[in-house]
Swiss-Prot record:
This is Dead end protein homolog 1. GO terms for cellular component: cytoplasm; cytosol; focal adhesion; nucleoplasm; nucleus. Keywords: Cytoplasm, Developmental protein, Nucleus, Repeat, RNA-binding. It comes from Homo sapiens. Pfam families: DND1_DSRM, RRM_1. Interacts with APOBEC3. RNA-binding factor that positively regulates gene expression by prohibiting miRNA-mediated gene suppression. Relieves miRNA repression in germline cells. Prohibits the function of several miRNAs by blocking the accessibility of target mRNAs. Sequence-specific RNA-binding factor that binds specifically to U-rich regions (URRs) in the 3' untranslated region (3'-UTR) of several mRNAs. Does not bind to miRNAs. May play a role during primordial germ cell (PGC) survival. However, does not seem to be essential for PGC migration. The gene is DND1. Residues 58-136, 140-213 form the RRM domain. InterPro entries: DND1_DSRM (IPR044448), DND1_RRM1 (IPR034414), Nucleotide-bd_a/b_plait_sf (IPR012677), RBD_domain_sf (IPR035979), RRM_dom (IPR000504). GO terms for biological process: 3'-UTR-mediated mRNA destabilization; germ cell development; mRNA stabilization; negative regulation of miRNA-mediated gene silencing; spermatogenesis. The lineage of its organism: Eukaryota, Metazoa, Chordata, Craniata, Vertebrata. GO terms for molecular function: mRNA 3'-UTR binding; mRNA binding. It is found in: Nucleus; Cytoplasm.
Amino acid sequence: MQSKRDCELWCERVNPENKAALEAWVRETGIRLVQVNGQRKYGGPPPGWVGSPPPAGSEVFIGRLPQDVYEHQLIPLFQRVGRLYEFRLMMTFSGLNRGFAYARYSSRRGAQAAIATLHNHPLRPSCPLLVCRSTEKCELSVDGLPPNLTRSALLLALQPLGPGLQEARLLPSPGPAPGQIALLKFSSHRAAAMAKKALVEGQSHLCGEQVAVEWLKPDLKQRLRQQLVGPFLRSPQPEGSQLALARDKLGFQGARATLQLLCQRMKLGSPVFLTKCLGIGPAGWHRFWYQVVIPGHPVPFSGLIWVVLTLDGRDGHEVAKDAVSVRLLQALSESGANLLWSAGAEAGTMVKQ
């Protein structure tokens, strides 16, 4: 087994010419490069920067890099087209780059100029660069939260993460156990990365629970969006007068009745509920599969929901239908309609939203 010193000596022997050229360039220019979590970074902000960070859309992705290329060749090239706010070169343990980097400009115009000028630029013979718009990761998923956690309690627990948090949503966890998943949206990739680091270094405990903190994956985001909103994102929206009339007529009659009247006003027909109990979890939570068929809509609305049954002996399927109605009304509200029904099920029913 190699010792630590053996590994260091091996790394020093990898690409020594370019490493020496980089060190000479750093000494001559006085530029400061910082190694952080597998990447070497310049700026963020650069010397003399005043004001807020650049807006979203000001960063480009740089691919197809030869692995022995360093900042002394890349930063001057990308500074030709605009002022750099930050440059990040992804690094391996051996000191070679990982084949890609990110350049963030002071404005979107700089990023557009880099794409127009440097995409397919021949850094070396038969080695054209790939330069395209960077899609910044600004969203995290936090899975494993308690079923009864409220959004206000979650926001209170997230306060130490700083002012970069822009949006927090609580949704039913896609996992098999009762629980919730939080989707957190931040103002920038840096703010999201700092929050992720803080949560992970805190042994991934939040609200007293062991949670899984990850970058929000596109497939998970799509699955949760379909579960929450489903086909109603494409549904015609009722007029404001119809919504007001539904609210005035129903008062506190119940979420299912509200949904029924709303569908009538939208000329969609009466919703038909199908439910199936899939099992019972801890603390009396019941997991239901549901499907709601609305005659005037081509696609049914389906998903999973957890409910706790009331003590008045109501049938579990009826409780689940009420809870599903609340979810559908909230989905309609979030997709553009006014809120018809306050968040929560009928009196005495606990619902995992």
